[in-house]
């Protein structure tokens, strides 16, 4: 982790089984007379998913602090925040085949193999593939095939049940003097790499197959970047369901500074100022005022696409011990269920309020009538639904025993309103709460 040298004796004591020679053969250490130095970064990594807790050891290249200088362009990144975000988002359903596009150190491929029978992992970097294969061997994970190449070229003509990608989406000026780090720079202008992924993924998905990735998108002038992403999805030759969530935005200067520091160039130096100028010139020339970051879930539609959701969730999420992927999977199933039901069929369901939902009421002192009712979700995306008296009452009465129709009928009498009008008012909210996981469908007896 620290990149510090150690004596041969200390290294032998720390590696009683592998030994220094074994570590050298694996490319983990370098020996210079009486001292050894690490050739790579080796860290423990632990996580919890739907299959339970697990621990791995992950090898990557030494970071800036250990090297003492800026990163080389062929640097292979270890497990960072983006890696853990994507692995947490990963659907955890059984799959026959999975693809990890842009595998880097191989962390997503290792996660995918826990649920897929066979995984293909690709990267443009031979060094990355070498370390990814080492990580698979180091952790006793088989069933992963490693291939060299860009984007979907290494899997031409193949289709997968699940595609995951933490692609090199960082927006980088295409000018001399700006490092093109393989782990983050896809070699395209602006956010074209994310657009290219969306355009190409459909033909590599089995019907009903899902692709998940992280990405950036640019705000040009005063246009909405999510509208641009929607246009990419609509332009896919293969019909796609889409769920895109923007998690954050950063202005042009802040974005540039973030990624210049990420490469190990320090603020206050001439090199930093030169790179910052290149980034800002590029953004100004192309009219970019800010950059969004978020999650994309794309599914090859089995017919006409029914899911088109583009939203912003910039705050904190709910508690998800086994990862947000569990909630995403449940949301997809709930979406498909309600999309196939007309209002009469939906009304016949007996729903139950999820166990992590709480109700919050705001009242003026001395008043019995709430001025606001909020239904808060503890897990999933941690959503808050603003409810009126009718929706709050329906939610509270949803115990899995009474149908939606029965609850609406009783509420109409209690509130002295027209039952049909109340149903028309409540059912769209019921559909949304079902998809978002505030309401669930228990087994229907």
What residue spans do the PLM features occupy?
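Mobile active-site "lid"/loop adjacent to the S-adenosyl-L-methionine
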Residues: 126-127, 165-196
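Acidic, low-complexity/disordered tracts enriched in E/D and polar residues
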Residues: 1, 41-43, 66, 303-396, ...
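Flexible, glycine-/basic-rich loop-and-beta segments that form/coincide
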Residues: 252-331
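Short "lid" loop at the C-terminus of a central beta-strand within the Rossmann-like core
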Residues: 153, 170, 187, 216-221, ...
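Conserved SAM/SAH cofactor-binding pocket of Class I
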Residues: 80-165, 171
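SAM-dependent Rossmann-like transferase core, predominantly class I methyltransferases
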Residues: 33-98, 103-111
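Conserved Class I SAM-dependent methyltransferase catalytic core
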Residues: 124-125, 190-245
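Long, charge-rich, low-complexity alpha-helical segments
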Residues: 1-41, 88, 99, 104, ...
